[in-house]
């Protein structure tokens, strides 16, 4: 149920669901080497939400049920609320029966991201990986999503890759990577006090009144 946030290359977290395997060392989920899991079981327990996920032609409910084909409408609505998607869905005349065009071309980038987060939540994963998946969402909504995660799914491990420090600063642990090496590990307060790279990114994003939304983080 802990959160560990990674601020560097997305390739690291792709080792967890075995999109590819590590050449050396081990990656463990629940203390078990991921290579010892049945691949289907592993990928049911790990959900990954990318910055640019895909929506399909069909209703909003159809798209959400790609996460769980047997999900009830009530379950879909609950997860949409956690992802702050319900608030804009309710503005559509047909609500959850609203038709989504192929690729989600008739919804905004932030709306698309929230729908794909809700879809991932329907899988009820043990590990939820958010790979820059709120980059198109405003900071206030991003904060609401993170608050809902803390309160409603505390038993799910969340691994967050983000462009904004505001998206990761309340995590249990933040991992700073530089050139593929661990440069720092700690809480937001600990890294602000001890880690030069984290301090630099934080200062660059807070200049001019603390508008995290206009400037990106470290790559």
Annotated model-derived regions:
Residues 1-6, 57, 161:
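Short, small-residue-biased leader/transition segments that mark boundaries at the very start
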Residues 16-17:
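Helix-to-loop junction immediately C-terminal to a conserved catalytic motif
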Residues 22, 28-30, 86-115, 130-133, ...:
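ABC-fold ATPase nucleotide-binding domain signature/coupling loops
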Residues 26-31, 36, 43, 61-102, ...:
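ABC ATPase nucleotide-binding domain helical subdomain, centered on the C-loop/LSGGQ "ABC signature"
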Residues 82, 91-95, 132, 140, ...:
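C-terminal portion of ABC ATPase nucleotide-binding domains
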Residues 122-126, 155:
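A short, proline-enriched helix->beta-strand linker immediately N-terminal to the Walker B motif
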